[in-house]
Design a protein with these regions (language model features):
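Conserved N-terminal beta-strand and adjoining loop/helix that marks the start
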Residues: 213-232
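Generic N-terminal initiation segments characterized by hydrophobic and/or small/turn-forming residues
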Residues: 2-3, 80, 227-233
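Catalytic cores of DNA base-excision repair glycosylases
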Residues: 3-4, 8-191, 197-206
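Conserved Nudix-box catalytic region and its N-terminal flanking loop in Nudix hydrolases
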Residues: 234-242
């Protein structure tokens, strides 16, 4: 599975700026920007950001106003502020932290970013698990379990994701899984016939990949009008007016 996935990734990965001449700083910036934001939206912002703030030290010495201004348009401004705080910490590093646990203690860094940074930039065998990975994994293994929500699915599937990590190329493996989810294993109309791991995919071979993952649909909240209260106060107001 890993060999098929990585061979495909080596030949078909998208040409993204944070993959060219990669560094710890570029990985951190890209992962912060890509939280809840599409790659196509991030691309121009990433290039401008790197030109303006080429390293942790430059970012750390910038004012918060400059940082937020450079982020303007990407939304979720807490990401920019946390990134600024992280840069101030990083500018004093003699060596970066090497474990997921240590990274999760930094501003704005959750399980996903911690695993992405440690695997991509530091070559540690730590698997990422987000919505893309949930979709890919539940389809490959045809996992019938219904999850309460996406966050629950990610937490439950993290051990499975970890068991599949390629220890020789953990960063490339994580990026390949993300690439697969973004470009082939779509939420709707997945491109199963061109999938590099189709031979390993139970739901794909059975022809019902779109049935996975199984996430409970959110129930619409029902709002009730308290007719009695409305009528009572309406009549009371009328009496007062008379």
């Amino acid at each position: 599975f890993q060999n098929s996935l990585l061979s495909w990734y080596d030949g078909y990965q998208r040409d993204l700026p944070w993959r060219c001449d990669p560094s710890l700083y570029k990985t951190v910036i890209s992962e912060f920007m890509l939280q809840q934001t599409r790659v196509s939206t991030v691309l121009p912002y990433f290039d401008r950001w790197i030109n303006k703030f080429p390293d942790f030290q430059t970012l750390a010495t910038a004012s918060e106003e400059e940082v937020v201004k450079a982020w303007e348009g990407l939304g979720y401004y807490s990401r920019a502020r946390n990134l600024h705080k992280l840069a101030k910490i990083a500018s004093d590093w003699k060596a970066p932290p090497e474990t997921v646990k240590e990274w999760k203690e930094l501003p704005g860094v959750g399980p996903y970013i911690a695993a992405a940074v440690t695997s991509i930039a530091l070559k540690k065998p730590e698997a990422v698990c987000d919505g893309n990975l949930v979709r890919v994994l539940t389809r490959i293994f045809a996992i019938d379990q219904e999850y309460k929500d996406g966050a629950t699915a990610q937490k439950k599937l993290q051990p499975l994701a970890q068991s599949l990590i390629d220890t020789d190329r953990p960063g490339d493996y994580n990026q390949a899984m993300m690439e697969l989810g973004a470009t082939v294993c779509h939420r709707q109309s997945p491109l199963c016939l061109t999938c590099p791991v189709m031979n390993f995919c139970e739901s794909g071979r059975a022809g019902h990949a779109e049935n996975f993952p199984k996430i409970q649909k959110k129930k619409n909240k029902k709002f009730f009008i308290h007719i009695f209260k409305f009528c009572f106060f309406s009549n009371l107001i009328k009496k007062i007016n008379y």
